[in-house]
């Protein structure tokens, strides 16, 4: 009976040991710095914002990770410096990462993926609205610097392509490319 219980305990422990160190969770402070382009309105801009962000990375191999970032921000839209109102967006971004050095203290990585941006809580000047949510690409580069066995300081930069329409009373006024560069610093824990 004891041998059977020991065998059952070993079998139950296998998945846990197989998953050891396959996950990383990071908490970052990020600066979302839009690189705004408008198809027909010169002077249209969207404010830069610092916000908290959380992300999860699953390592499918020692050098290959899949990261999902989650964060939201509220920006002010302006035209030639005059406020047009505020809008919020949620751009979950999924990237496939390559980690160059999976074991040393300094672990640089690069990634590429996609984002889906959902605009919500849009409070623009009367008659103005955001016309659509957005799918776009994402590129990233970063480094994890070990400070403990499983703890890391993280520096990260992403370029995310976000595109929508601005409408006036339901009629498309302009195409708006927000396309932010996202700078981040944070702490990660691998488990």
Stretch-by-stretch model annotation:
Residues 37-41, 80-82, 122-124, 166-169:
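Outer-membrane beta-barrel and related beta-rich outer-membrane complex signature
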Residues 20-33:
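Transmembrane beta-strand segments of Gram-negative outer membrane beta-barrel proteins
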Residues 26-28, 55-59, 140-146, 152-154:
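Short, conserved structural micro-motifs that define repeat-unit consensus positions
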Residues 1-22:
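Cleavable N-terminal export/targeting peptides
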Residues 13-17, 99, 147:
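Hydrophobic membrane-targeting alpha-helices
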Residues 75-79, 86, 148-191:
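Predominantly the C-terminal beta-signal and adjacent terminal strand-loop region
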Residues 21-22, 55-124, 134, 183-191:
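Gram-negative (and chloroplast) outer-membrane scaffold detector with strong preference
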């Amino acid at each position: 009976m004891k041998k059977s219980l020991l065998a059952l305990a070993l079998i139950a422990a296998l998945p846990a040991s197989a998953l050891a160190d396959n996950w990383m969770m990071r908490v970052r402070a990020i600066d979302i710095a839009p690189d705004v382009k408008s198809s027909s309105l010169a002077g249209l801009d969207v404010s830069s914002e610092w916000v908290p962000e959380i992300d999860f990375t699953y390592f499918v191999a020692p050098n290959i990770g899949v990261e999902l970032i989650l964060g939201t921000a509220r920006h002010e839209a302006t035209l030639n410096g005059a406020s047009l109102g505020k809008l919020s967006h949620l751009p979950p971004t999924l990237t496939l990462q390559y980690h160059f050095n999976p074991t040393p203290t300094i672990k640089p990585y690069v990634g590429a993926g996609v984002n889906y941006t959902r605009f919500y809580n849009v409070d623009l000047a009367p008659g103005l609205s955001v016309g659509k949510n957005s799918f776009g690409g994402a590129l990233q580069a970063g480094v994890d610097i070990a400070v403990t066995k499983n703890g890391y300081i993280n520096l990260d930069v992403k370029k995310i392509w976000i595109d929508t329409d601005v409408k006036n009373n339901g009629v498309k006024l302009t195409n708006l490319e927000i396309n932010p560069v996202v700078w981040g610093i944070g702490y990660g824990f691998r488990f």
